[in-house]
Amino acid sequence: MLKEISVPCSLVRDGEFQVMEQCTRIRGADALTYLDREKFLPALGDLNISCVICKPEFAGKIPEHIRGIIFSDDPKLIFFLLHNAVGTFVENVPTKIDSSARISPLAYVAPYNVIIGPRSIIGPFVMVGEGTEIQEDVHIHEGCTIGAQGFTSVRNGDAMFLAKDLGKVRIERGVEICAHCDVARGTLLLDTTVLGAYTKLDAKVHIGHGSVLGKRVLVPSGAHIAGNCVVGDDVWIGVNATVSNRIKIGEGARVSLGSVVTKDVPAGQTVTGNFAIDHARFMKNLKASVLEADSRDNCPPPVDKQD
């Protein structure tokens, strides 16, 4: 019940909720969400939303199916203060490690809420955090962090804090993760960071919270995939590429080395550059720039005319 919330806010109408979700990504029934910008008002039409935290200026614009309403000048702050408080009540289930799994004595596996499947290998100095499921035949090399703290930052006056990660990580069968990679845990309870079957990460790759990688995705060294991205099957992410948050990359697409991806990439397309565009278009633009530069360089020097 909303009336049981012990964070500073103004209860307008009480209501019940089962999950906490961002308004543009509702996946469960009876969801509590927050609204801090008018452009997201249409998202409140989702019938799975039962309660909302919003600014007083949105009074009268809330759909009738939303039973619970809280007013606050900072809805995001109230939402994540509550989210962090809910995290203290998460059930702890003892960790289960298959007898055929090989765990380095120098690795750390959380004592609760971890599952490690048959024949999986956990190397030295690996940290496996709570909420992690590692399926069969997975190999995680030295120095990796699985279930790392994500980077959902929230401002509280002059201070800031990070939202607790209450979601999960799922590493599917046949995945191999090379040295010193970080895979962040999902933030909200229904968020799961996923590495699909037979996906391979090279050294020093970062996978942000809640991102979902499909099957057989290849991510070479130094690439960064920000939070809540969706990457299709058989995608190639090039060396030192950066993928911004909430980006969708379609099946079989390729991101060239060093590219910065800020827009969705259709299936089968290759993108290149900073900011990344279609590879053929990038090469056309590059050739035009080179020809223009050559033309300037080959121009005869101006003649110094004397009277």
Range-by-range predicted roles:
Residues 1-100, 137, 143-144, 148-162, ...:
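Terminal amphipathic alpha-helical/low-complexity segments used for targeting or macromolecular assembly
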Residues 34, 96-278:
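Structural signal for interior beta-strand "rungs" in well-ordered beta-sheet cores
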